[in-house]
């Protein structure tokens, strides 16, 4: 076993990486509120795992979406648990994200030299809210349908570009199959990809700059 480890160590310098991770200085003022970002990340990973599991059963069509969700909840093995964990972790992710933003703001974590860390964090907050909006519609029940209709209708108040923007969001003049397809694609592919990209920008900056000091 040691020979296998030595082989990888010689090529990847595993011990140096482990030492860098475990020996990072943590300021004495850090408390449990500095863990909110990590909890948000954990919730995101739970979302990815449970969401991926549900894609095996969910059908993104206006005629089958609701019945497929019912199948997940009543017939699929542990489907009720997976969907429930997905919903609970979604709520927890939004709550932890909001508290994390407040903590960073109140402790001055957005100030020089951490401006870019703050900007990427704000983008991640917007993406988190977008997850909620797009995911809410996927069961295609009465609540989801009317929520989508209201949300996608908001840009209509914008002069000149309002109507084209609404049609872009809905995929047509009215809410229907094109809308559900768009929201499903956003929720399961576009938003997770963008979130992963911005997290890969956000965390290395935190690692490089360290935790901000007390006010």
From Swiss-Prot:
Topology in the lipid bilayer: Multi-pass membrane protein
Regions crossing the membrane: 32-52, 90-110, 116-136, 186-206
Binding site for heme c: 35
Annotated keywords: Chloroplast, Electron transport, Heme, Iron, Membrane, Metal-binding, Photosynthesis, Plastid, Thylakoid, Transmembrane, Transmembrane helix, Transport
Co-factor binding comment: Binds 2 heme b groups non-covalently with two histidine residues as axial ligands. Binds one heme group covalently by a single cysteine link with no axial amino acid ligand. This heme was named heme ci.
Residues where heme b 2 binds: 86, 187
One Pfam family named in its UniProt record: Cytochrome_B
Single Gene Ontology BP annotation: respiratory electron transport chain
Gene Ontology annotations for the cellular component aspect, listed alphabetically: chloroplast thylakoid membrane
SUPFAM superfamilies for this protein: Transmembrane di-heme cytochromes
Binding site for heme b 1: 100, 202
Keyword Electron transport: yes
PROSITE patterns for the chain: CYTB_NTER
InterPro entries xref list: Cyt_b/b6_N, Cyt_B6_PetB, Cytb/b6-like_sf, Cytochrome_b_N_euk/bac, Di-haem_cyt_TM
Role summary: Component of the cytochrome b6-f complex, which mediates electron transfer between photosystem II (PSII) and photosystem I (PSI), cyclic electron flow around PSI, and state transitions.
Family statement: Belongs to the cytochrome b family. PetB subfamily.
Protein name: Cytochrome b6
Gene name of the record: petB
